[in-house]
UniProtKB/Swiss-Prot annotation:
Family as reported in the entry's similarity comment: Belongs to the universal ribosomal protein uL22 family.
Keyword presence, RNA-binding: yes
SUPFAM superfamilies with a match to the protein in the record: Ribosomal protein L22 (SSF54843)
Molecular function via GO: rRNA binding; structural constituent of ribosome
Subunit relationships: Part of the 50S ribosomal subunit.
Gene Ontology CC annotation, any one: cytosolic large ribosomal subunit
UniProt keyword annotations, A-Z: Ribonucleoprotein, Ribosomal protein, RNA-binding, rRNA-binding
Protein's gene: rpl22
UniProt-listed InterPro entries: Ribosomal_uL22, Ribosomal_uL22_euk/arc, Ribosomal_uL22_sf
Record organism: Methanosarcina acetivorans (strain ATCC 35395 / DSM 2834 / JCM 12185 / C2A)
GO biological process: cytoplasmic translation
Domain of life: Archaea
Name of the molecule in the record: Large ribosomal subunit protein uL22
Disordered: region residues: 1-23
Length: 151
């Protein structure tokens, strides 16, 4: 596995970082979730992700929205990416724990950076009839999140 660095570096005294490596979630869905929570307070983002997991609130899809239906609220196309939201919530909780360990106040922190990068592809094959095989690849995602006290 290659060494993965953060895209940006903030002030180490006022920021906390967390990263999730090679998570088995969709890159397209995780991109849309990260775009939505970027700029939110950490507590608001946690509530939003928990509502998405419970299918109470949809995530607006702005780029990858073919075949998506209209949802309630100020959005056109939206979906409920449950598995991506669960993994991003884990990374957010990790970033809050890192902030608490550093002596920062997690309740007052904003998400200044939430980004995904495509990870490696896990190649696999599915056996088919008559001795054939169909490729079945699993995409992975690297998520990085940076919280800051000042906005």
């Amino acid at each position: 596995m290659a060494r993965i660095n953060y895209s940006i570096n903030g002030d180490p005294e006022t920021t906390s970082k967390a990263m999730g490596s090679e998570l088995h979630i969709s890159p397209k869905k995780s991109r849309e979730v990260c775009c939505k929570i970027k700029g939110m307070k950490a507590s608001e983002a946690r509530k939003f992700l928990e509502d998405v997991i419970a299918m109470k609130q949809a995530v607006p899809f702005k780029k990858h929205h073919d075949g998506s239906g209209h949802r309630k609220g100020p959005m056109a196309a939206g979906k409920y990416p449950i598995s991506a939201s669960k993994e991003i919530l884990k990374v957010l909780k990790n970033a809050e724990s890192n902030a608490e360990y550093k002596g920062l106040e997690p309740a007052n922190m904003y998400i200044i950076h939430a980004a995904i990068q495509r990870g490696r592809v896990i190649h696999g094959f599915m056996p088919r009839a008559r001795g054939r095989a169909t490729p079945k690849d699993t995409e992975t995602v690297n998520i990085e999140m940076i919280l800051s006290e000042v906005r």
